[in-house]
Amino acid sequence: MNSGPGKKPDWLKIKLTSGSSFASTKKLLNKHSLHTVCRSAMCPNLHECWSKGTATFLLLGNVCTRSCRFCAVGTERRPAMPDPEETAKIGEAVKAMKLRHAVLTSVNRDDLADGGAAHWVETIRAIREVNPGVSIECLIPDFQGDEQALDSVMRERPEVLNHNIETVPSRYASVRPQASYERSLAVIERAKRQFRLATKSGMMVGMGETPEEVNAALRDLRAHGCDMVTIGQYLQPTATHLPVSRYVTPEEFERYREIALDAGFRHVQSGPFVRSSYHAEAFEPVEEISNS
């Protein structure tokens, strides 16, 4: 029987930082009533990123229609309708924050006919309208495999198209039962093969997977056209969420980084606090990737 991961190790102790940039970022987001995955998903890097004046915008509200057992975002079967002013607010926030690289993500909205794809498109266009030259990274949901919805977002040609597999296939039933490993791989493949976009994905470890399974998942991602990958430690957000199976050591994360680079990934972020959008600007430039 698994007795749990034990005491949280020293390498997982967060150093909180703040300052003027942190305060101004928080004030700006509150002013526009904008959601961020940093806050809604209880990201451990919130203080670091906000102190640097960066944030990942959360589209379509902060309530999800799915109930993945690792995620801190709230869930409902029928959340409130999306705020039609959110798109313009995000565009203005990107301008006010003077971002060079804007990162967008969203909750799953399986209650909407298009999964929220039109809202995604409007947001991308709103950002570009008032922020010429800014690069955009889109961490999209799977839109339940709806090709029309996927294509509408991909046709906007974000500089990075990100979709997370989150975990290895053997853990899907326990970790994200409303998702499909194969469907997630198909999203990445579609972005690369049909739209020639720079592609990115991510996964968490410490949820009961084996190193061999992580290595196999990395090979699967490369085989489906994934250019960039993030690997981070799963941290249980509340007592009702999936328990941590074990704490992966920094040395193991370094081995995963080396394995990913050997597999052919162009950029790799692998470490205990790494998340999908952590140091997202480090994945630039992407021109040579999207044309590969």
From Swiss-Prot:
Q: Which residues bind [4Fe-4S] cluster 2?
A: 64, 68, 71
Q: How is the cofactor bound?
A: Binds 2 [4Fe-4S] clusters per subunit. One cluster is coordinated with 3 cysteines and an exchangeable S-adenosyl-L-methionine.
From which domain of life does this come? Bacteria
Residue ranges annotated for the Radical SAM core domain, each copy included: 50-266
Q: Where in the cell is it found?
A: Cytoplasm
InterPro entries per UniProt = Aldolase_TIM, Elp3/MiaA/NifB-like_rSAM, Lipoyl_synth, rSAM
Pathway membership of this protein?
Protein modification; protein lipoylation via endogenous pathway; protein N(6)-(lipoyl)lysine from octanoyl-[acyl-carrier-protein]: step 2/2
GO MF terms held by the record: 4 iron, 4 sulfur cluster binding; lipoate synthase activity; metal ion binding
Cofactor(s) this protein requires: [4Fe-4S] cluster
> Keywords in UniProt for this one?
4Fe-4S, Cytoplasm, Iron, Iron-sulfur, Metal-binding, S-adenosyl-L-methionine, Transferase
Its top-level enzyme class, in one word, is: transferase
EC number per UniProt = 2.8.1.8
Q: Which CDD domains match?
A: Radical_SAM
The residues that hold [4Fe-4S] cluster 1 are 38, 43, 49, 277
Q: Which reaction does it catalyse?
A: [[Fe-S] cluster scaffold protein carrying a second [4Fe-4S](2+) cluster] + N(6)-octanoyl-L-lysyl-[protein] + 2 oxidized [2Fe-2S]-[ferredoxin] + 2 S-adenosyl-L-methionine + 4 H(+) = [[Fe-S] cluster scaffold protein] + N(6)-[(R)-dihydrolipoyl]-L-lysyl-[protein] + 4 Fe(3+) + 2 hydrogen sulfide + 2 5'-deoxyadenosine + 2 L-methionine + 2 reduced [2Fe-2S]-[ferredoxin]
Show the GO cellular component annotation of the record. cytoplasm
Recorded hits in PANTHER family, A to Z, give: LIPOYL SYNTHASE, LIPOYL SYNTHASE, MITOCHONDRIAL
Q: Which HAMAP family match?
A: Lipoyl_synth
Q: Family per UniProt?
A: Belongs to the radical SAM superfamily. Lipoyl synthase family.
Name recorded for this polypeptide:
Lipoyl synthase
Q: Could you tell me which species this protein originates from?
A: Chlorobaculum parvum (strain DSM 263 / NCIMB 8327)
> Gene encoding this chain?
lipA
